[in-house]
């Protein structure tokens, strides 16, 4: 699913949202998540999963063109860990829909 497909789904699910408002909501959420991760914070969405950072230590690599050894510096990369409900749902074992899919749940 692409970002534009996510925006379209959000607009379909909530008819009171104009497509432009749904796009703004998705962009705002993604910006907030990006900002939090860039500051080293962890993001947890219960029932869905968590986003965090994994540290990749410095290492000696090899330039594929010249074969020369190069020092690759330490870096942090974003990482997603799915929650139990999402893992079970993807695996097909969960009998109940996620709370966000429950039309009777008016949060």
From Swiss-Prot:
InterPro entries: Hist_DNA-bd, IHF-like_DNA-bd_dom_sf, IHF_beta. One of its GO terms (biological process) is DNA recombination. One of its GO terms (cellular component) is cytosol. Residues 56-107 are annotated as: Disordered. Residues 82-101 have a biased composition (Basic and acidic residues). GO terms for molecular function: DNA binding; structural constituent of chromatin. Pfam families: Bac_DNA_binding (PF00216). Keywords: DNA recombination, DNA-binding, Transcription, Transcription regulation, Translation regulation. NCBIfam families: hip, PRK00199.1. This protein is one of the two subunits of integration host factor, a specific DNA-binding protein that functions in genetic recombination as well as in transcriptional and translational control. HAMAP family: IHF_beta. Heterodimer of an alpha and a beta chain. Belongs to the bacterial histone-like protein family. This is Integration host factor subunit beta. The gene is ihfB.
């Amino acid at each position: 699913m692409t970002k534009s497909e996510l925006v379209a789904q959000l607009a379909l699910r909530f008819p009171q949202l104009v497509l432009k408002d749904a796009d703004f909501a998705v962009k705002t959420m993604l910006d907030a998540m990006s900002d939090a991760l860039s500051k080293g914070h962890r993001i947890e969405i219960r029932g869905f999963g968590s986003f965090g950072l994994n540290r990749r230590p410095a290492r000696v690599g090899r330039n594929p063109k010249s074969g020369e050894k190069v020092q690759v510096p330490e870096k942090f990369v974003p990482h997603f860990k799915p929650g139990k409900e999402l893992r079970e749902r993807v695996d097909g074992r969960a009998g109940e829909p996620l709370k966000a899919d429950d039309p009777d749940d008016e949060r």
